[in-house]
Amino acid sequence: MGVKEIVSNRKAFHHYEVLETLDAGIVLTGTEIKSLRDHGGNLGDAYVTISKGEAWLLQSSIALYRFGNINNHEERRKRKLLLHKYEIHKLDARISQKGLTVVPLSFFFSKGFVKVRIGCCRGKKAHDKRQSIIEREKNRELAAAMKRSYR
């Protein structure tokens, strides 16, 4: 079985420069898994924090399961990330550096389990955002020119 992406945080790639990525497991309830299978998640303003030696995903939204009953999950709650101790220490050291933060980049299925791809990021300034847009446009024009030349 391959990797199937469920939800991606496109806003993170626009607002942050991703320096390093890491895949982590996540503790979810049954209705959260079912809701994610229906692509019912949002990572727009989510972030990762470390407290008491554990990594937590905050402000992530997983939509309520439409067939759920009274035992349905809370839409926005703290969700524990499953990482090795050395990975947590490494993330904690990165977070303590000025200007760095850890944000979730995507939810994906790997071998039937939901995983979270998190990234150590540095915030982009306005001119950096414009520069990345200009580079993206140049690459798009170059690809279009190459495609026309092969016809």
Curated annotation (Swiss-Prot):
What organism is recorded for this protein? Answer: Chlamydia trachomatis serovar D (strain ATCC VR-885 / DSM 19411 / UW-3/Cx)
Q: Which domain of life is it from?
A: Bacteria
Q: Which GO terms describe its molecular function?
A: RNA binding
What do the Gene Ontology cellular component annotations say? cytosol
PANTHER family membership? SSRA-BINDING PROTEIN, TMRNA-BINDING COMPONENT OF TRANS-TRANSLATION TAGGING COMPLEX
User: What InterPro entries does the database record attribute to this sequence?
Assistant: SmpB, SsrA-bd_prot, SsrA-bd_prot_CS
Describe the function of this protein.
Answer: Required for rescue of stalled ribosomes mediated by trans-translation. Binds to transfer-messenger RNA (tmRNA), required for stable association of tmRNA with ribosomes. tmRNA and SmpB together mimic tRNA shape, replacing the anticodon stem-loop with SmpB. tmRNA is encoded by the ssrA gene; the 2 termini fold to resemble tRNA(Ala) and it encodes a 'tag peptide', a short internal open reading frame. During trans-translation Ala-aminoacylated tmRNA acts like a tRNA, entering the A-site of stalled ribosomes, displacing the stalled mRNA.
User: From which residue to which does the signal peptide run?
Assistant: none
Presence of the UniProt keyword Cytoplasm in the record: yes
Record's keyword terms, sorted: Cytoplasm, RNA-binding
Biological process, per Gene Ontology: trans-translation
Q: What is this protein called in UniProt? A: SsrA-binding protein
Q: Which cell locations does it reside in?
A: Cytoplasm
- Establish whether keyword Kinase is in the entry: no
Q: Which family does it belong to?
A: Belongs to the SmpB family.
